[in-house]
């Protein structure tokens, strides 16, 4: 989103319904264009948004990363 949002929860709290729906629609279009939709029989994807110190957020504005095109494996070790 183009607004002054710092992270996902800030975006959900302060963003308009139109902005929130718009971002989700754009994410879907990108995933579809990248040919990653599991509902179309493709391999899938992962959406990441880092937030705060524990989330290792280095850039102080809200954005998402879309990963796909290969097996991504686990990013965080499984806790017993």
Model-derived features: positions:
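HIT superfamily nucleotide-processing domains
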Residues: 1-80
């Amino acid at each position: 989103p183009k607004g002054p949002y710092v992270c996902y929860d800030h975006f959900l709290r302060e963003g308009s319904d139109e902005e929130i729906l718009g971002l989700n629609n754009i994410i879907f279009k990108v995933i579809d264009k990248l040919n990653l939709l599991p509902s179309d029989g493709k391999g899938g994807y992962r959406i990441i948004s880092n937030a705060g110190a524990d989330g290792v957020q280095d850039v102080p504005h809200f954005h998402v990363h879309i990963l796909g095109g290969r097996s991504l494996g686990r990013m965080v070790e499984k806790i017993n």
